[in-house]
Amino acid sequence: MADLAKIVEDLSALTVLEAAELSKLLEEKWGVSAAAPVAVAAAGGAAPAAAAEEKTEFDVVLADGGANKINVIKEVRALTGLGLKEAKDLVEGAPKAVKEGASKDEAEKIKAQLEAAGAKVELK
């Protein structure tokens, strides 16, 4: 047990660069790859219908600023806290995300506010 405590102590003392080098050495020694978890994540996407039902985070995407861009810019500023130039760039550069990782209720509220201002909005 003392050996394990010593190993933990030694690993804790490593710098980030040393830890990265250790990781590479262990991959070579054991013949494994750190990329393996990516394959597991890709396999998890095999059931998109189930994932769509359980989706809890949404991205509010401004698809088009519409004809009344001034009102849309004002609404984007109010919702995001962006400055005038940043909000204008976001509206004119549509399609762009206004809010990422929003809850369903928050995303629908933001969508309704932007649509009331004249924008076309998508939830992703």
From Swiss-Prot:
The keyword Ribonucleoprotein applies. One of its GO terms (molecular function) is mRNA binding. The keyword Repeat does not apply. It holds the Pfam family Ribosomal_L12_N. GO terms for biological process: translation. GO terms for cellular component: cytosolic large ribosomal subunit. Keywords: Ribonucleoprotein, Ribosomal protein. InterPro entries: Ribosomal_bL12, Ribosomal_bL12_C, Ribosomal_bL12_C/ClpS-like, Ribosomal_bL12_oligo, Ribosomal_bL12_oligo_N_sf. Belongs to the bacterial ribosomal protein bL12 family. Forms part of the ribosomal stalk which helps the ribosome interact with GTP-bound translation factors. Is thus essential for accurate translation. PANTHER family: 39S RIBOSOMAL PROTEIN L12 (PTHR45987), LARGE RIBOSOMAL SUBUNIT PROTEIN BL12M (PTHR45987:SF4). Homodimer. Part of the ribosomal stalk of the 50S ribosomal subunit. Forms a multimeric L10(L12)X complex, where L10 forms an elongated spine to which 2 to 4 L12 dimers bind in a sequential fashion. Binds GTP-bound translation factors. This is Large ribosomal subunit protein bL12. It comes from Brucella canis (strain ATCC 23365 / NCTC 10854 / RM-666). The lineage of its organism: Bacteria, Pseudomonadati, Pseudomonadota, Alphaproteobacteria, Hyphomicrobiales. The gene is rplL.
